[in-house]
Amino acid sequence: VIESHADARYSFGKFKKKHFGPSGSWEAQVCELPNLRHLRVFQAVARLGSISGASREARVSQPAVTQGIAKLEAMLDVVLFERRQSGCYLTEYGRAYLARTDRMFAEMEGGLVAPRVGPPFADDKSLKSILAKTTATHVRALMAVAEHRSIETAALKLGISASSLTRAARDLEGVLRRTLFHPGLQGLTPTKPATELARRFGLACRELTYATEEIATLKGMSTSRVVIGTLPLFPVDLIARSVDDVLRIYPGTRVLVVEGAYLSLLDDLRAGKIDFLVSVLRRPNWAEDVDEEPLFRDPYAIVARRGHPLSRCRNITLQDLARFEWVLPELGTPRRMAFEHMFAGFSPKPKTSIETRSIEFQRGMLSTSDRVSIVTRQETMLEERIGALAALPFAPPVSRNADGIATRANWRPTIVQLAFLDLLRRNSRDILSIPQSAVPSSDQRGQVTPRWPALPVTGPAKRRERALVGAMPRS
């Protein structure tokens, strides 16, 4: 792709087509970013309702405006405007694309004017000029370097020359009049403000990915991709049932479930690599750009192998449990903190020489020994169905945070994502033990439900949704 002004000096054709993951992956977000000038012209035509008005505002010829709109329509394979003698009017697809385009530029503007790290890159006076000079190639270059942590490593991973990537990165520095990269052990590496700006640019690109998915859904041929983050020990039944339900409504949907450590998943959520996080709610204070919605409370239980010596006891005490070795996750995790709280001031404390987050490894260590562990009630039910472990008759004297959904603040779900969230809420009622007043009702979930109404589901997808929801039991 060769864009206006500085882009005439270098091409990112290979960068775009060959070296990123499949469409819908986080890396592919940069590939789906069209010419930013075309997007700005599209906004102008939508706002002014005419080609001539947009031409005057953008200071380009009317044929250039027409060509820019035509390229967007060809890329999306839809008609964005109805052309009439009285002007240009957005179609249903055009309205969907405009909403996401507006959000994309708002995200970019926020990253430039109000970054979370370092001083602003722009103020109200310089913002318009900087946005006009920033190109899709600049965005791709910054995101690639931030992802791979150095220009040299990014160029090697992408199969392009370091000089081409360096020119794009340096040109962006000239546009912003800020140093974005500094020498490191692996060559030029991004500064912290540059890494944060790349994150905001990534979220901006994600809006256009959502736009293409919403347009496909409106056409009755959903190709949406839902990326869910979850912890290794989170109740799998809830997610599995919700995935199965959403695939019946939108058969073309691709669902990716990513397991990992909480803080790693939180970073992925904030960067737009995952759409939402389903886990125990434990947002740190610094993550002000993340919202949480409680769904249910899953209390702790103590598990051991079937036939464990304590399974025959009626009144188990902490002294009894302290005689056995424990298998636990590492320090700082909720279950480990619950264990530490249980045995606070207890001497001697139980032996804890084995640390793991792996369900399979924990099951193996417990099923072949007299070791014990602390898990949730839902995890206990799963282990009992498998037949490997059983709950001991002991109620841990510790409370547990609610489980629920974490999303980016001001996030606007796609049609399919919104359906998946509603299915999570519906299915979570089967294990709901939180007081109903503590769980937002459908009209109180401002943290997850978009501030704008979701685009209406029409055609075959709507009929499938009605059929499935009507068949579901209501609590």
Give, region by region, the residue ranges found by the protein language model.
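Short beta-strand-centered segments that line the small-molecule binding cleft or hinge
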Residues: 2-5, 13-14, 133, 263-300, ...
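Short helix-boundary/capping micro-motifs
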Residues: 45-59, 145-157
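A short LG(V/I)-centered, amphipathic sequence patch enriched
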Residues: 73-90, 173-190
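Central regulatory/effector-binding core of bacterial HTH transcription factors
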Residues: 148, 153-163, 224-282, 475
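Hydrophobic hinge/microswitch elements
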Residues: 261, 270-273, 280, 332, ...
